[in-house]
Amino acid sequence: MTTRPPSLPPGPRLPRLAQSALWAVYPGALSRYCKRRFGPTFTLRPLGIGDVVVVTQPEAIKEVFTGDREVLRAGEANAVMGPIVGKHSLLTLDGERHIRHRRLVSAPFHGEAVRTYGERVAQIAAAEVDRWPVGREFPIRPRMQAITLEVILRTVVGVSDERRMERLRTLLRKITQVGVVEMWIVWAYPHLIEHPVVKRLSTLRLMPEVDRLLYEEIAAHRAEPDGRDDVLALLVAARDEQGEGLSDEELRDHLITLLVAGHETTTTALAWCFERLLRHPAAHLRLQRELDEGADERYLDAVLNETLRVRPVIDAVWRKLSAPVEVAGWLLPAGATVMPSIEIVQHSAAFADAGAFRPERFLEGSAGGRASHPYTFIPFGGGARRCVGASFAMMEMRAIVRTVLERVSLRAPTARSERVKVHHITLVPARGGRVIVTGRRRGVPRAETACTAAPRAEVPETRRPALA
């Protein structure tokens, strides 16, 4: 047993306000600078959150993901999200309650249950894609958001009342537009959430109506359970080992987690997929050809995985320490927050030519390029807290990308990469992933027609500003 006192790794001495501002706007740039300056494990001190220890090495990340869950508490770290997602959300639960809820919630998001939704997702995507203008530049992220929101409302919540559906669409679009300043206030000063002025001016003012609509849908599902195959119907029917189901409040919290967190992350991943693909003509051409020829989805999966690697949707995940614990050789004190950096580990030397967009690295038998350590690729987190909706998200992205490329030919308006911008908790294309539809595809034309207007040369990718 060690007798050394807990301590923190070194970190920048900037004032807390300056660290908060840099972390809120340029999280990746700040982390990259600190890694160069202080090494692979360092401490940030933003306002209101306390000491945040960032770990960037696979072995240290493994220690965080596989360590004692009673000490490394994800729910406590996410507690500031409680006013939106609720106290029963998988994001905010710890311990036995998290285990119970995860078991109940997991079933609809795995295996055959997920595969049955693929055709429905494709139909929703096709209806949206057929409305896209030809020959005019537009950001693809809002279009992806329209698709993913509809998928969530129809396949997850199973909303059948059109008036309820339209109102939920409107409210959820507003909620997902929360700005960096409001988000930072929530993270840094959670006690302000209960202030009447903050409630009136923030997106929290919308939550009572969202809750009312969700409770109406839950009641409708309980009253008429037969003939429904949406996720909510499966959650209503789910029972634990004691035969207990989920309460209305618990169902509400899981639904709002999926609505607010789930569809926003998938939206962003899809926007980055097209932003990357359209700037890499060889990958675009190969994917188009394989889809046209009815090949399996291995290369499509490789494109999606490489997108999630080079453009992670969130910068990091975190755990709050309830007791001292050793991570990366440091005995960290209770009360500190440990934050595995998704972006840094996925751009590490573990990947050959890590900055390049190379889907082939994810194909079995490819000529190198893919890291062998399992904790170098963590877009959905890891361990017992790995995203419960990961399989659903991958199914959804496959169906949407396939549908888009089957129905329209796309090109990027410029060869220059879009920079990364912080949009509350997600890292989005700064210009929304702008695209141009060059034509509608009738039948399945030769794959080459989809890529003729792609940029001829790859312009070096622009990274978030480095800190000197």
What are these regions (language model features)?
Residues P333-A334:
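Residue-level recognition of short, solvent-exposed, well-ordered loop/turn junctions
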Residues T265-E290, S391-V408:
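Cytochrome P450 catalytic-core helices
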Residues P340-G368, C451:
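Conserved cytochrome P450 K-helix/beta-meander segment immediately N-terminal to the heme-binding cysteine loop
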Residues K35, A125, R173-K174, D292-A295, ...:
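Cytochrome P450 proximal C-terminal region
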Residues M1-R100, R115, E119-A127, V159-R163, ...:
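N-terminal membrane-proximal hinge/A-helix region immediately C-terminal to the signal-anchor transmembrane segment
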Residues T2-L8, R73-M81, R97, A113-T268, ...:
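Cytochrome P450 heme-thiolate monooxygenase catalytic core
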Residues Q19-G39, R212, G294-A328:
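Conserved cytochrome P450 K-helix E-x-x-R motif and the immediately C-terminal K′/meander segment
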